[in-house]
Amino acid sequence: QRQMCIRDSFDDYIMSPNESLILIQTDTKPIYRHSFTANYYIFNVKNNKMEPLSTGGPQQVPLFSPDGNQIAFVRNNNIYLVKLLFNNSESQITTDGKYNEVLNGIPDWVYEEEFGFNRAFDFSADSKMIAYIRFDESKVPMYSFPLYKGKSPSLDQYATYPGEYEYKYPMPGIDNSKVSVHTFDIKSKVTRKIDLPLDEDGYIPRIKFTLSLIHI
């Protein structure tokens, strides 16, 4: 039987693996080329009910676990986990995320721009672990540029005086973010750092578990 979403409009959606749930994306606010925040709602196809993914603030890059029983997402540079079989209980996986210093599970500006992705974490195939990239951009200098009223969209707050936008931007020869890979065991809640055959200034352009669960 066809079910109707009870929300009048939305920006995008994500289906659960068995298509019994739909994540409804609303109130989308762009950050950079690929990244954005949004408010997500979990729509149950069977009972036609919808509830917020989280009430703690806008979310980024939500991802269903392969078994469809969990959703991980990023908020304020930290990774969170919602367990759908336990009344959508929410727990925080990382705690050191901080604006302009540390990003967990989402890339910095350079990675997003050059490698073209906005999510830096993944579930294992058995849904028991999460692997993620941690970006330490605390040593990357700030870069600023002026903001004017302009058009499409019009920034009316800068109609008389220009504003200024600052973000972390490494010029040639300046340090990039320091990157590392970590795993989180959902049952034991143990986080481990993975030793990688990577130079200090090396890149990690993607993160993905293999189906065998042996490699990342």
Regions picked out by a protein language model, each given a short descriptive name:
Residues 7, 56-60, 97-100, 198-202:
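Short coil/turn segments at the loop-to-beta-strand junctions that recur within blades
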Residues 17-18, 66-67, 125-126, 211:
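Residue-level detector of Asp-centered blade-edge/turn motifs that repeat once per structural unit
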Residues 27-32, 36-39, 93-121, 129-187, ...:
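Predominantly five- to eight-bladed beta-propeller fold
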Residues 9, 58, 117, 177, ...:
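Beta-rich catalytic cores
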Residues 22, 68-71, 130, 213-214:
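Hydrophobic beta-strand positions that form the internal "hydrophobic ladder"
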Residues 45-48, 84-87, 186-189:
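Short loop/turn segments that connect beta-strands within beta-propeller blades
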Residues 2-6:
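Short, small-residue-biased leader/transition segments that mark boundaries at the very start
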